[in-house]
C-alpha cells in the first residue's frame, strides 16, 4: 500500500479509496495505517507529495507550477503555502541553504563510475526509521534475526535502501529498508518489496556507515547536478558485501537515471562500459 501511495503522489489520499484497494473497512484501514506510520494517512500522503515535489525543484530546477502539479495542488499559491508549512521556508530559501551542503559533500564522492541496465527485482525487506547511520545497523541486525536455521542454496544479496532525502524528511520519518534475495527462507514478518529496473549510474564505495550516507548525499547534490543525466522516479540503493553494518563496508551504490537523456559526463573517475545486471 505504501508503494502505491508513493507511486501516486498527486492523489488525494482519500481513505475510502485506499481502504478499498486494501480490501478492509475505512475505519480499520485508518487505524492500522496511522499506528504503523505514526501519523494520519492524509498527513503521510501530503508530506510525501511535498517531499517528492521539493526534491524535483532542488535537483532538477522544476518550477513552482510544475512542482505544484506533481504534488497534486490546483494552484501554485496553495502549493507554496503548504511547502512553507511543511519545511519552514520557501523553495528558494531551501535551495539557497543547500549550497553549503553541496560544497561540503563534494569530497565524499565515490569512485569507479559505470552504467548498467538492471532488471527489476523482488526482495524481502525490513524497515527501520531514523538517521541512516543508526537505522541501518538496527535494520540489518533485525533482518539477520528473522532467518530460520539453515544454509541458503546461494550466497545472499544484501541491498540497503535509504528511502528519503535527509534535507527534506524529518529524522524520525526517514526510512531505511534492509533487503535480501526473496529466494532465502525467512520469517513471515518481512515484507516483499519491488526494486525498480532500468538504467543506473553505479559507483564503488569503501568505508564506514557514516561515509556511506555522505556518499549518497555527494551523488545527489554534487555529482548529479553536473552529470547531464535526469534522475528517474526511483530510490537510489546500495548493494553490500556485509549485512551486519560493522566496520568498513564495501558496496556498490546504484543511482537511478533515465535512458532517454544523454549519458552523464565522466568525472575524474574511470567510466566502464554499460552492461546488463540482474542484481543477483
Please annotate each region the language model reported.
Residues 3, 31, 81:
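Active-site phosphate/pyrophosphate- and oxyanion-stabilizing loops and adjacent acidic/basic residues
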Residues 7-11:
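Short helix-capping/hinge SLiMs at alpha-helix to coil transitions
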Residues 1-4, 48-55:
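Pre-recognition alpha-helix immediately N-terminal to the DNA-recognition helix
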Residues 5, 29, 219:
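Conserved hydrophobic/aromatic pocket- or pore-lining residues that grip, position, or stack substrates
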Residues 17, 35, 39, 43, ...:
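A solvent-exposed interaction/effector surface
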Residues 14-36:
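Basic, low-complexity segments
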